[in-house]
Curated annotation (Swiss-Prot):
It comes from the Bacteria. It comes from Yersinia pestis. GO terms for cellular component: plasma membrane. This is UPF0283 membrane protein YPO2347/y1985/YP_2134. Keywords: Cell inner membrane, Cell membrane, Membrane, Transmembrane, Transmembrane helix. It is a multi-pass membrane protein. It is found in: Cell inner membrane. The keyword Membrane applies. PANTHER family: UPF0283 MEMBRANE PROTEIN YCJF (PTHR39342:SF1).
């Protein structure tokens, strides 16, 4: 038996129709736009953060243009021209009057002024090379995303000359043998970063390990805090000078102060989060105090500070940005320091007993 029909249902509001998706118009990419296109990678977020820090450091490197600076420069130029004109007049008068004492004093003063001007020019040139290294990293960063051809090889050969690598260097020969005419600028720079640049980076890493170990051992065995502070400061400055020399940067007085200040500035911008990320949580999971003395723990801290200064000095002196997996980590230096201290301190204890 069939079921009775249901009554009709009247809806007060009309049924809502589904919204059709709005499609964007087609967009065609030409060859010029395709060369500038590169896919986005989420793993590059950390590198973007470091790039912002690098931008802040580069801004600190570049001199600030201001009206007062221009006025002071113009005043110094006018004063220098006046001193030169007055010196010429004094020399002329002393020569005519045969005043040999005044002539000798004027000549000596002129030589001192020339020596001072030469020192200023030399310091400016060294500061310029330090600023130029930051510009070279920007150029390298642009070439690493470029699909062009021709500029990468010229740029890398310039870096090799600045580093003092001759044509017979094994790393440079391997790089030249690996090049092919089909390689673009990005591939050429990547090959240079993987084959040639490690020859300098390994030397810098060895210097950092040696200086960090010396600082850690000095703090661990020395009972005088003032001597420790002076020793650490002296060794850190020596380390920065050594790393700069390895990468072909000649430091003067002001450029050395500028580089040391930029290293500290870079560390301040990086913050403590990078230290925790690189060292890891094994500081909390392992009972360090049970295995090493308090002085040894202080030595490890001083050694890590030296290693951190060295790593930041490498970043500022390298002509190329870090590629993935190339940047040295504090955890590697920490393990080396702990092994050296564990092998050294027990020997000292045995000899004392």
């Amino acid at each position: 038996m069939s079921e009775p029909l249901k009554p009709r249902i009247d809806f007060e509001q009309p049924l809502q129709s589904l919204d059709e998706p709005v499609l964007k118009s087609a967009q065609a990419f030409d060859e010029q736009a395709a060369e500038k296109f590169y896919p986005a990678a989420p793993e590059l977020d950390a590198e973007d953060e470091e790039g912002r820090v690098e931008g802040l450091v580069n801004a600190a490197l570049k001199p600030k243009r201001s009206l007062w600076r221009k006025m002071v420069t113009a005043g110094m130029v006018i004063l220098g021209a006046s001193v030169i004109a007055q010196s010429v007049q004094w020399v002329n008068q002393a020569w005519q009057q045969q005043d040999w004492i005044a002539l000798g004093a004027t000549t000596a003063g002129g030589l001192i002024i020339l020596a001072g001007v030469g020192s200023v020019v030399t310091e400016w040139r060294r500061l310029y090379h330090l600023r130029q290294r930051a510009e070279e990293r920007d150029i390298a960063r642009a070439l690493l995303v470029s699909h062009g051809v021709g500029q990468g090889r010229v740029f890398c050969e310039k870096l090799a000359r600045q580093a003092g690598l001759d044509q017979g260097h094994p790393a440079l020969q391997r790089w030249q043998a690996s090049l092919h005419e089909t390689h673009n600028d990005r591939e050429v720079v990547e090959l240079y970063a993987k084959l040639v640049q490690p020859a300098l980076d390994n030397q810098a890493r060895a210097e950092i390990s040696r200086y960090a170990a010396e600082s850690a051992l000095m703090i661990a065995v020395s009972p005088l805090a003032l001597v420790d502070m002076a020793f650490i400061a002296w060794r850190n400055i020596r380390l920065i000078n050594r790393i700069a020399a390895l990468y072909g940067i000649e430091l003067g007085y002001f450029s050395r102060i500028r580089l040391f200040r930029l290293v500290l500035l870079n560390i301040a911008f990086a913050g403590a989060s990078e230290l925790v990320r690189e060292v890891g949580m094994d500081w909390l999971s392992q009972d360090l105090a049970a295995r090493l003395s308090a002085r040894a723990a202080q030595g490890i801290g001083a050694g890590l500070l030296t290693a951190r200064l060295g790593i930041k000095a490498m970043e500022l002196c390298r002509p190329l940005p870090w590629l993935e997996g190339d940047k040295p980590k504090l955890g590697d230096f920490r393990r080396q320091l702990m092994n050296q201290l564990k092998n050294t301190l027990p020997k000292k204890d045995k000899t004392a007993h």
